[in-house]
């Protein structure tokens, strides 16, 4: 972490980077050094949510990775994060992006879009965009 902090400082990059952190302690480490930095925090379950919540890092400094989908298991966490003004991100890269056919991927993307994530991370953003356009019609 120290090397990353040194690089951010050297490049004066705190205003235009977002760091992914996996624990509240990591979030606090970077926040203490760069109070305006944006952090992508892990909040896939209650344990991770609580770890971030007690870190003392302001909610305004966070977006939250909630897993590969928004579902019954994490919906309450997503709602709680939203109540704090935190945008929630899911990642389809390790799941839907790996499906062999574009039609299958499109169908899965539409399922995720229906859960209203704030951010969708994908290795095939053009296909996610096509699904977003199709859903909007």
What do the PLM-derived regions correspond to, one by one?
Residues 12-19, 37-39, 116-119:
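Short active-site oxyanion
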Residues 1-10, 26-41, 46-57, 100-103:
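Distinct, well-ordered alpha-helical segments
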Residues 25-26, 127:
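Alpha-helix capping/helix-boundary segments
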Residues 1, 7-13, 20, 78-82, ...:
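Secondary-structure boundary/capping motif
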Residues 19-22, 70:
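Alpha-helix N-cap/loop-to-helix boundary motif
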């Amino acid at each position: 972490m120290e090397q990353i902090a040194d690089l951010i400082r050297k490049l004066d990059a705190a205003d235009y980077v977002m760091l992914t952190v996996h624990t509240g302690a990591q979030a606090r480490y970077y926040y203490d050094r760069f109070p305006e930095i944006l952090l992508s925090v892990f909040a896939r379950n209650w344990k991770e949510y609580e770890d971030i919540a007690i870190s003392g890092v302001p909610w305004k400094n966070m977006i939250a990775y909630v897993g590969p989908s928004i579902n019954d298991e994490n919906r309450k966490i997503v709602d709680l994060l939203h109540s704090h003004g935190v945008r929630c991100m899911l990642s389809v890269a390790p799941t839907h992006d790996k499906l062999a056919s574009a039609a299958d991927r499109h169908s899965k993307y539409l399922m995720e879009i229906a859960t209203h994530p704030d951010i969708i991370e994908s290795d095939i953003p053009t296909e996610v965009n096509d699904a977003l356009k199709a859903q909007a019609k």
